[in-house]
Structure formats: structure tokens, C-alpha cells
Design a protein with these regions (language model features):
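Generic recognition of flexible, low-complexity loop/linker segments
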Residues: 14-17, 74-81, 86, 118-121
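Conserved P-loop NTPase catalytic core
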Residues: 7-40, 44, 118-190
Length: 190
């Protein structure tokens, strides 16, 4: 939201952030070691989050859906009835660990990747955005060669933003470990 802008020191980043500040409701979730399909994990998280912000929507059961795009369109219609001027951003962490575990489940990962592909399609036409954190270039990983075709179709629908080690070092040094003058004085005195 706009109140977070004061914490941004880099002028270009701050200007870019102003354009979207407060324009999205944000669901952040971490996928743990789960047996559920990616579809069911994300749908359950979405339904719970939407309910917590006053949006009433239930996805149809997985066995009744032939394409999730219509379900997302209906979800966003319900969302916009309550928040007409905002979008919905879903941020998922640890997606790579989840997908790695799913590679051993045969066709399960293909269904998960198909669901991701549908999410990518939805993002193009709705005020819905999806962001996932992975620790390696999953689209080029040898671990997923057996589902390379499915991965390619997912890749075509998402923009990748690689983060280099130098980027991580910068964030740690400038954001996490940076000290104020008062903090530095206390450290020196100690």
C-alpha cells in the first residue's frame, strides 16, 4: 500500500512503486510439504483469503471444471463487486520445493503445470496477478526434463525476473543490515 513508499530509498523503484501502490489486495502464501494438488492448494488459500476480506466466492469442485479460466473470471467478478478499483495479487513462496516433490508423482505435476498455465492466461485478461518465488531457473532445469513441454507452455505465459546473487547481497546490505547513525554510534560505543 502507499504507506510503504516511505521505506523505498531508490528513486526509480519508488517512482515505479507509486504507480501500483494501493491498487492490489495481496495474498501471500508459502507452499509447504503438501500432498494436495497445486490447484487445490491455491484455490483453498484464495477462498479463505477472499472470505477474510469480505468477498464471497467458492471455486467449483475440481472434478466439475474443464477449464479454470471461467472460474477465475467469476472469482474476479465477485472480487470487483466489493473492490471495484483494485486488483488481486497472489504471491507464492517455495513453489520450486513443491514442484520438485511433485515430479515423483507422475502425471500430478503435469496437472499442476497445466493449472499454472491457466493462471498465466488469466493474468493477461483480468486484474489478477500471480507471482511465485523459485530458487533456480526452473524452466531450464534438468530436474524437470520429463515435463519440458508442459514447462514451456507455462513459461510462455509468465515473465521471469531473475535475481542474481549481487542483487541479494545488495538487499541484505542496504535493507536488512543498514544501520542508522544512532545505531552505528551505539555499536561503536559497545
Amino acid at each position: 500500500d502507499a504507506s510503504c513508499l516511505d521505506g523505498i530509498r531508490h528513486p526509480a523503484v519508488k517512482d515505479a512503486a507509486k504507480q501500483i501502490a494501493g491498487r492490489f489486495k495481496v495474498l501471500r502464501t508459502v507452499i509447504g510439504a503438501a500432498e494436495k494438488s497445486l490447484r487445490n492448494l491455491l484455490v483453498d488459500e484464495l477462498v479463505e483469503y477472499l472470505s477474510s476480506i469480505g468477498v464471497n466466492y467458492d471455486f467449483p469442485p475440481a472434478d466439475k471444471v474443464t477449464n479454470h479460466i471461467r472460474a477465475f473470471e467469476d472469482m474476479m467478478a465477485a472480487f470487483h463487486a466489493v473492490y471495484p478499483d483494485q486488483g488481486l495479487l497472489v504471491v507464492v513462496d517455495e513453489l520450486l520445493d513443491y514442484l520438485r516433490a511433485r515430479t515423483e508423482k507422475g502425471e500430478a505435476i503435469v496437472l499442476d503445470l497445466s493449472f499454472l498455465r491457466e493462471i498465466g492466461e488469466v493474468c493477461k485478461g483480468l486484474n489478477f496477478r500471480f507471482m511465485a518465488g523459485v530458487q533456480e531457473a526452473v524452466f531450464d532445469s534438468h530436474r524437470f526434463q520429463h515435463v519440458a513441454d508442459s514447462l514451456r507452455r507455462v513459461k510462455d505465459r509468465f515473465e521471469q525476473i531473475p535475481i542474481a546473487r549481487n542483487d541479494v547481497k545488495f538487499v541484505v546490505a542496504e535493507r536488512l543490515l543498514r544501520k542508522t547513525a544512532d545505531q552505528l554510534a551505539k555499536i561503536r560505543d559497545h
